[in-house]
Amino acid sequence: MIRYSIIATGSKGNAVKIDDILIDCGVSFKKLKDVYKYIRLVLLTHEHSDHFRPSTIRKLAAERPTLRFGCCRWMVPKLIDCGVSPTQIDVYDIGKRYDYKVFALSPIKLYHDVPNCGYRLYFGRKRVLYATDTRTMEGISAK
């Protein structure tokens, strides 16, 4: 069973926990207090403040120096500006598959007013598609 928790969704902040993955970090650190110790990877979609809060990223990086951050190339400078070490960042290319020990992921292109991606997540035979802030999803599925 895939466990998930919607921490926040909407224009004031977005953060979703799926198993031990946090997708988007547009909330205060206080809202993550019950989950931040249990996440192994933070996936980021784009730079808008309701998805990416620099103060929270800074605090996560400081509190959890072994925490991994995953994103497409356009987010790397933003993470480094928040004090995340380049050695903590997994950089993804759209359409490629990346295998971790207990899950895999593949970033998908989304259409927004800034560069944006979603994620296909694979947990064995189970799949999750995470997509937000997009004008279209033509041809996109969880396959």
Predicted features and spans:
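Conserved beta-strand hairpin/beta-sheet module of binuclear metal-dependent hydrolase folds
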Residues: 1-35, 117-133
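Active-site environment of divalent metal-dependent phosphoester hydrolases
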Residues: 12, 30, 48-52, 76-78, ...
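Short acidic-hydrophobic surface loop/beta-edge motif
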Residues: 16-18, 94-102, 121
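Active-site metal-binding motif and surrounding structural segment of the metallo-beta-lactamase
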Residues: 28-71, 75
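Short, aromatic/basic amphipathic alpha-helical patches
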Residues: 79-88
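Short acidic-hydrophobic, aromatic-tinged amphipathic segments that line or gate anion-handling sites
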Residues: 89-93
